[in-house]
Amino acid sequence: MSRIQSTFAALAAKNKKGLIPFITAGDPAPDLTVPLMHALVAGGADILELGVPFSDPMAEGPVIQRACERALKFNVSLHDVLGFVSEFRKTDTTTPVVLMGYANPIERMGQTAFVLAAKAAGVDGTIVVDYPPEECEEFAATLKANDMDPIFLLSPTSTEERIQQVAKFGSGFSYYVSLKGVTGSANIDTQDVAQRIEAIRKHVKLPIGVGFGIRDAATAKAVATVSDAVVIGSRIIQELENTPRERAVEAAQTFISGIRKALDE
């Protein structure tokens, strides 16, 4: 059982919902990434999602695009991101870390080389936005063989065929993108999300995390009633943007603590 699977099993046993915060590695500065990761765990995160900076993040809204730009100004590479995970693992061997990004940096490193380096660093899973499940059977199998989970995105426009492919190739959890569009955009219709997740669960037996558009504790709580976990990214990055650097770590922990409290009420 992978660390992600164990985490969801433990949450289910306690009748709790998962909290999965997202930050972009290297933003607002590389030396803050590992302290931010620890602060998010201290604030109640169950799984961490670490964004790999990329110059053309097509699924991201302006907030995460700016985060990528800031990280790339520090020349943060995939190699550096794996270094952050290794550093984090020195003092936290239990919290799962999922890398989220795009195919290009992985292709440049080579899929097998990436999987081996990710395993050595202590990565638990990947979300590769532009790797559809039907095109990465081999990559998914290599990840699973190395105790990591290939996590795939589903959206309001996903066909039944795509949902079945995610059921076949995915593991760990499935990430339901609650809005058509980019991260950080409009408000969520929880009833619509509930109906879509019900349809997905007919095929996908994995836990389902919902992200895109979760802005505050109330939205997180509403979404958690129909899912197994909530993913929250743009709002955390906005907190970091609006906070002086010396208070960034504290601000992230305070924000995520508020979300955790709402989920547990």
UniProtKB/Swiss-Prot annotation:
One of its GO terms (cellular component) is cytosol. Gene3D superfamilies: Aldolase class I. InterPro entries: Aldolase_TIM, RibuloseP-bd_barrel, Trp_synthase_alpha_AS, Trp_synthase_suA. It holds the Pfam family Trp_syntA. SUPFAM superfamilies: Ribulose-phoshate binding barrel. The alpha subunit is responsible for the aldol cleavage of indoleglycerol phosphate to indole and glyceraldehyde 3-phosphate. Its EC number is 4.2.1.20. The keyword Lyase applies. The keyword Transmembrane does not apply. Belongs to the TrpA family. HAMAP family: Trp_synth_alpha. Keywords: Amino-acid biosynthesis, Aromatic amino acid biosynthesis, Lyase, Tryptophan biosynthesis. It comes from Herminiimonas arsenicoxydans. GO terms for molecular function: tryptophan synthase activity. This is Tryptophan synthase alpha chain. It catalyses: (1S,2R)-1-C-(indol-3-yl)glycerol 3-phosphate + L-serine = D-glyceraldehyde 3-phosphate + L-tryptophan + H2O. The active site is at residues 49, 60. Tetramer of two alpha and two beta chains. Pathway: Amino-acid biosynthesis; L-tryptophan biosynthesis; L-tryptophan from chorismate: step 5/5.
